[in-house]
Structure formats: C-alpha cells, structure tokens
Amino acid sequence: MEVFVPFDATDPKTRLSDLLDADERSAVARAMLRDVLDALAETPHQPRVLATEDVDCSAPVTVDDRPLTPAVNDALAAVDGPAAVVMADLALVTPDALGRLFEPDAGVVLAPGLGGGTNALLARRPAFRVDYHGFSYRDHVEAATAVGGDVVTVDSFRLAVDVDAPDDLVEVLLHTDGRTAATLHSLGVELAPTESRGAVTRRS
C-alpha cells in the first residue's frame, strides 16, 4: 500500500516564527519528515512524499506545489487500491502507532488531531476524497459515510500531536529522542517548566 506524506518544503511551520528563523524552521520540518519516514520504514508499506519542491529524503518524492487538498486528492485518485496519508509533522509517531492506523479493516480509518484536523488516514474506498481545513476530521467522517464506507477512528496520542506552534514542541522534547528532538536540542530549544504547564525556551 502506498502512503503519501505531504510536505511543505517552501515555507514550513510559520507559526514557529517567534522561536525559530526560516532556516531553523526548515531544519525542524525536515527532521520531522525524516522521523515520519523512519517510522514508516518499519512498516510493510511504501511512503511517497508529496512536496511543494524537491527535498532530499529516503522516499520517492512527487513535486506538487498546489494546496494540500487538491494535491492529495489527485494522488489518491491515481492509486488503484487502498492508500494512506500521514502528515509530515507527526514527530511523535512510531511504527506501533502507524500499525494502529493500518490494521482496522474499514472503508476509511481516521486519526484526528488534537484541534479537530485529520493527521492521518487510510482509504479503502476509491471514491473517498479529502478536504483539509481546521475541523476536517468531522467532514472526513461525513465524506466517508457518503461514499458508503464504514469509519474507524484511531485514538492515538502519537498520531494526534502534530507540530505547528511552540507549545507543541514540549511534547517532542518530552516524549521522543529522534531527529526532531536532536535538531531542537542543537538549536538550543529546551523545556521551560512553568507553574501551569510546560513550555519551551531557547538558550541564550
């Protein structure tokens, strides 16, 4: 089964701008992509990166600079059989977490993000199409039902945490020791406990 990994190689992770400059954000984004590809390499499935420009990585790359939704939908339409989509910013993902996505025998399997988005999915219904936006999980449930697919939702912390904002980096530093965590450490990003909850800061 082919697994598409969308990746913004042009101007990634702009919500980290208060903490990281453009080159640093690019380095973190590429580290996350490689963490995701490392996890996928331990599954039986073949990843393909859908990138806005060419990127050096361990998987084949298809360059498509269109917005996320049309790029993914055209990729899904070109596949004869089941296909999955796993976002490139799931820095906490593990082979076991991916196994929970790939295992259910359902028409559509969805892994929602913490804010209501869709962080990963598996589609066995050829007519299923995506529509990515803030609350896309809810709409993807409806879209799967509309094409006659039974839907399974995967409740997984490691699939639910995607890295967009500085607070998300807390989870990376707490729960992983992969390429992303190493890159953050090299940039001087570290945990900064507060009275209410953890945060991150940069060493001066």
Feature names for model-found ranges:
Residues 29-46:
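A short, N-terminal amphipathic alpha-helix
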Residues 122-146, 204:
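Short, glycine-/small-residue-rich phosphate/pyrophosphate-handling segment
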Residues 1-16:
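N-terminal nucleotide-binding beta1-loop-alpha1 segment
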Residues 87-91:
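The conserved acidic donor/metal-binding loop of glycosyltransferases
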Residues 93-117:
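Conserved donor-nucleotide/metal-binding helix-loop-beta segment in metal-dependent transferases, i.e.
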Residues 147-204:
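Conserved alpha/beta core of the MobA/IspD/sugar-nucleotide pyrophosphorylase nucleotidyltransferase superfamily
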Residues 58-84:
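Short phosphate-binding loop-to-helix
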Residues 46-52:
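Short, hydrophobic beta-strand segments that form beta-sheet elements in well-ordered domains
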